[in-house]
């Protein structure tokens, strides 16, 4: 089997395609959450704590010297990334929780045992009659009104 054929068989498998779709959707979802946090959550939060813009928070480790830029420890971006992570983790948690609830409800639904077919009922009756014949103390009774 050639490498190209093996790769084609690998790439077309359902799991690989599903994983690729999940990664692409996850990346797009990450962009949405980052925008939500940066554009919707952080501005009001900054106003509540005194007009601070988290993305600009930094500690200058070395000031700019001539053409060399300043060396900054940009902890504000880190805070924003942590908030992004918390929101994404919470959204995923809620999604998994909903899926698990649906699975539990599906598992709780009682399944009725299948009703036996006519053949199974007749075979059970024949079995019971044969057992009764092999037992000397039990009389054999046949219902003449019953027809096969």
UniProtKB/Swiss-Prot annotation:
Please give the start and end residues of each transmembrane region.
Answer: 9-29, 79-99
Looking at the keywords, is Phosphoprotein present? no
Record's function text? Channel that opens in response to stretch forces in the membrane lipid bilayer. May participate in the regulation of osmotic pressure changes within the cell.
List the taxonomic lineage: Bacteria, Pseudomonadati, Pseudomonadota, Gammaproteobacteria, Pseudomonadales
Q: What organism is this sequence from?
A: Pseudomonas syringae pv. tomato (strain ATCC BAA-871 / DC3000)
Task: Determine the domain of life of the protein's source.
Answer: Bacteria
Q: Which gene encodes it?
A: mscL
Topological category with respect to the lipid bilayer: Multi-pass membrane protein
Per the record, the similarity remark reads: Belongs to the MscL family.
Q: Which UniProt keywords apply?
A: Cell inner membrane, Cell membrane, Ion channel, Ion transport, Membrane, Transmembrane, Transmembrane helix, Transport
NCBIfam families assigned? mscL, PRK00567.1-4
GO molecular function per UniProt: mechanosensitive monoatomic ion channel activity
- One cellular component (GO) term of this entry: plasma membrane
Q: What is this protein called?
A: Large-conductance mechanosensitive channel
Q: How does it assemble?
A: Homopentamer.
Q: Where in the cell is it found?
A: Cell inner membrane
Q: Which PANTHER family match?
A: LARGE-CONDUCTANCE MECHANOSENSITIVE CHANNEL, MECHANOSENSITIVE CHANNEL MSCL
One Pfam family of this protein, by short name? MscL
């Amino acid at each position: 089997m050639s490498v190209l054929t093996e790769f084609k068989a690998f790439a077309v498998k359902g799991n690989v395609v599903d994983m690729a779709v999940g990664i692409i959707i996850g990346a797009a979802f990450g962009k949405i959450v980052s925008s939500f946090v940066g554009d919707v959550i952080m501005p009001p939060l900054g106003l509540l704590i005194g007009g601070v813009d988290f993305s600009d928070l930094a500690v200058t480790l070395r000031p700019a010297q001539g053409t060399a830029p300043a060396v900054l420890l940009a902890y504000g971006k880190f805070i924003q990334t942590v908030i992004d992570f918390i929101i994404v983790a919470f959204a995923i948690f809620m999604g998994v929780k909903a899926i698990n609830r649906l699975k539990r409800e599906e598992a709780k639904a009682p399944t009725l045992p299948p009703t036996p077919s006519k053949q199974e009922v007749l075979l059970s009756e024949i079995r019971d009659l044969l057992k009764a014949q092999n037992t000397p103390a039990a009389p054999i009774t046949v219902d003449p009104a019953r027809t096969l």
